[in-house]
Each structure stands twice: as C-alpha cells, then as structure tokens.
Swiss-Prot record:
EngA-type G domain span: 4-165, 172-347
Descriptive protein name: GTPase Der
Record-linked NCBIfam families: GTPase_EngA (TIGR03594), small_GTP (TIGR00231)
Biological role stated in the UniProt entry: GTPase that plays an essential role in the late steps of ribosome biogenesis.
Molecular function per GO: GTP binding; ribosome binding
Lineage: Bacteria, Bacillati, Mycoplasmatota, Mycoplasmoidales, Metamycoplasmataceae
Matches recorded under PANTHER family: GTPASE DER
Gene: der
Organism: Mycoplasmopsis agalactiae (strain NCTC 10123 / CIP 59.7 / PG2)
Length: 436
C-alpha cells in the first residue's frame, strides 16, 4: 500500500500532466492496475523537503459523455480513494464551469482534504477571482509550466501527510476483508465486545480506517478495520473497484486475513477475486462464512459448502473454512481458535537439523524422478525468517527440480508440521551457492 499520496484531479487541458511531470522531474510514469483502459492512473514518486511523496495523475473529467469518460471517472474516483490529499487543478484564467462545480462537489463528498490550485498563471494579474465562488478558503495560483507557486502548494500538502517513522507496528496484523454488507463491522464488534479488551487505538495510520491493538487470550493483535465503502455510485463498478483495491492493500499489509463471505448469497465475483489474489500471492487467509444462522441446514450442509469452496479453489487444502454468525456470536470462539492457531503456525521456529532429517526421510520414501538430465538430491534445509513459512533447500542442481516433486515435498512438510492457514514457499539453491 502506497503512503503519503497526492491525487491530481481536474478537467481536461487544465495542466494536470504538466504539474505531474513538474513534480516528478519529467520521468516516465508507470501505468497501474487496468491495462487496456484508455486513461489509467499514472503513479510516480518525488521528494519535497526531504520527504518522499507519491503522486497520481488522472484523466480529465467532464460531464459530457465522451469516449471512455466512464472509465476515466472510475479511475479518478479510485485515485481519490487512495489519496491522503487531493489537488483540484483548474485553469486560473478561465471562468468557472459546470464541470468544475461538479468535480468540486464530488471531491467534497469524498471527505478528503482539497487544495484548489489555479494553473496557467504565468501572469498573476490574469487570475479570475470567480474561482473563490467554489467556497474554498484559499486558491493557490501557480504556473505548472514554469514552476511558479508550486512550493507553496506542496507545503500545504505536507500538512495532510504522515511521515511518522514509528508507524511500523510490532504486533501481529489481522485484517477482516469482505464485500459491502458481508458483515465485517458485525464481526469486528463481536470480537471487540465479547473476546478482547482494547489496549490502544492507532488513529490516522491508514487511509482504510482505524487500527486497534487488541488482546485475544493473552495475544496482542492489531486488527485492521477495512469497513467503510458503502456509499452509492452512479457508476456500477466504482464501489467494487474501490473495495477490491482496499481489500488487496489489506491483504498485502496483514500477517493474516479473514475473508468474510455472505452465506445467503452465491459466491460473488468480489470473493473469488480476493481469494484468488491471496492464493496467487501467498497470503495467509481464513475463509469465514457468515450469516450461517440464516441458512436452512441439514447434517451435511456445512460439509457440502466446504466441498463447494474446495472445488472452486483447487490445491488449497491448507485454507481453513469456518462458519459463524457475527450477529448472534455463534462460533466466534471457534474462529478465534483458528486465528490464534494460524498465528502460532506462522511464527513457528524449526531447527535446521529437524527439517533436514524430515527431508532426507522424504527422499527415502520417494526419491526425486529424473528430470532435465539428472536427479535431484537435497543435502540439507533450513527455514528462513519471513512473513510466511519459507524453506531453503540446498541441492546438487536446482534445474533437476520437477514441479510435482516440489509439491510432494510441501505435502511432506504439511503432514509432519502444523501449517494450517499458511502458504508455504520453497526455494531451491545449488549447494555451491549456500552462502548467498
């Protein structure tokens, strides 16, 4: 998740990209997230007064429906959601228009700090004071082309950014992720009111809400509240885009994530995207099926639901699935049991000698098949310090590794060491490079 972000928003041809390039030194920008869309968000970073700042350039917003305007507006709204502060840039020589008023109203509804910047003022006397009719306390006057006045704008931006180096949390991070109305807030409240005492609140350390350090059965855990995207939108995709972006950021930031599914609905596109992202990127997750009290159940209903999830997401037997009712508090204790078990698994230390003996026994049970002109031989192994269990195997030649044998080795590790809820990463290194 990027921190200390400025989004540049405005109509076409008001100088957004000129300001963007002035800030980043005209370096080539990077297009993120949505290849094939005509005008994606452009990201870069720059330094001001010794502080590293991220900036997003966006496409020009218009009321008139032109080609790709819906996509441009979606991209702009996502940029606003990501930003700590928004620069609303206008043509300072031109009169205010209905497009400008519409954009400013949209920015006000976002709740983000807004800095109104009147551009194209190589000659300050040409400034149209009608821009104050927007209601902004101050309108900064600049020339992005020549760099005039930009320093004052950046000094104002710094007031809304957080450069506290102590933001790194020493606690285990748990996030609750789900689409709107899946029950995230209810689950957070169930954990809060019934199972923990608040140790401290950390406000302002995330754009996605408030983080609370809680104590669960003697374990201090930082819970990341990702709730909050519930507002209506004229563009159908906007809410899901924002929710997906927020959820993926939480997955990246967390040590463990609870992916909350609404059992009263079919598995949603949102759920599939989040679970798929977690599995592809080796993120520890617990799938939590909520509102289970509303389901007409038989003795086999729970197992049938588990099978449906397993069939949808192949090769993930390590992902635990729990069924709860956040509203009634049913099975919340069981969910906490799993959270603490996964935490224990992620933090487990293994002596190199124990791991090496396990791998040697595995090779005796099933030797590696010939592959690429040779047969793999593993001499010794060790576990490295990492957010997920990561094992380094020192071998005769890593080109002899067949994917099926790597899968076999992972299965042997899981059968002998408790790693429920944890992805496993195996790295092969040639023995001659063991000190790399």
């Amino acid at each position: 998740m990027k921190k200390n972000v400025i989004a540049i928003i405005g109509k076409p041809n008001v100088g957004k990209s000129t300001l963007f390039n002035r800030l980043v030194g005209k370096r080539s920008s990077i297009t993120f997230d949505r290849p094939g869309v005509t005008r994606d968000r452009l990201y870069e970073s720059f330094t001001w007064n010794g502080k590293e700042i991220n900036v997003i350039d966006t496409g020009g917003i218009q009321i008139e429906k032109k080609d790709f305007q819906d996509q441009i507006l979606i991209q702009a709204k996502i940029a606003i959601e990501e930003a700590n502060v928004v620069i609303f840039i206008v043509d300072g020589q031109a009169a205010i228009t209905s497009d400008d008023k519409m954009i400013y109203s949209m920015l006000q509804k976002s709740g983000k700090p807004i800095i109104v910047v009147a551009n194209k003022l190589d000659n300050i006397s040409k400034f149209d004071y009608g821009w104050y009719s927007l209601g902004a306390d101050h309108v900064f006057r600049i020339s992005a082309l020549h760099g005039n006045g930009i320093g004052d704008v950046l000094d104002q931006c710094l007031k809304y950014l957080n450069f506290d180096s102590d933001n790194v949390s020493p606690y285990f991070k748990l996030s609750i992720i789900g689409q709107p109305n899946s029950g995230k807030s209810s689950l957070l409240n169930a954990i809060t009111h019934e199972n923990r005492s608040i140790v401290s609140d950390i406000a302002g350390t995330t754009r996605d809400g408030v983080k609370s350090v809680v104590e669960l059965r003697g374990h201090k855990i930082e819970i990341i509240d990702t709730a909050g995207i519930t507002r209506k939108s004229k563009i159908d995709d906007t809410v899901e885009h924002l929710a997906l972006k927020r959820a993926m950021s939480s997955l990246d930031e967390s040590d463990l994530s609870i992916v909350l599914i609404n059992s009263t609905r079919e598995l949603a596109h949102f759920d599939a995207r989040i679970i798929g992202y977690a599995l592809e990127n080796n993120k520890p997750i617990i799938i939590c099926v909520n509102k289970w009290d509303l389901i007409n159940k038989t003795q086999d209903t729970m197992n049938e639901y588990r099978k449906k999830l397993k069939n949808r997401f192949h090769f993930v037997p390590w992902v635990p699935v729990e069924f709860i009712s956040a509203k009634t508090g049913s099975r919340i204790d069981k969910l906490i049991d799993i959270v603490l078990k996964v935490k224990e698994n992620l933090e487990r230390e293994i002596k190199p000698s124990v791991l090496t003996n396990l791998i040697r026994e595995s090779q005796l049970i099933q030797p590696a098949p010939p592959y690429n002109g040779g047969r793999l031989n593993i001499y010794f192994a060790r576990k490295t310090e990492n957010k997920i269990p990561t094992f380094i195997f020192f071998v005769n030649n890593k080109k002899f590794v067949h994917f099926s044998y790597q899968r076999f080795l992972e299965k042997q590790i899981r059968q002998n060491i408790e790693y429920t809820g944890c992805p496993i990463n195996i790295i092969f290194k040639n023995k001659s490079n063991e000190f790399e």
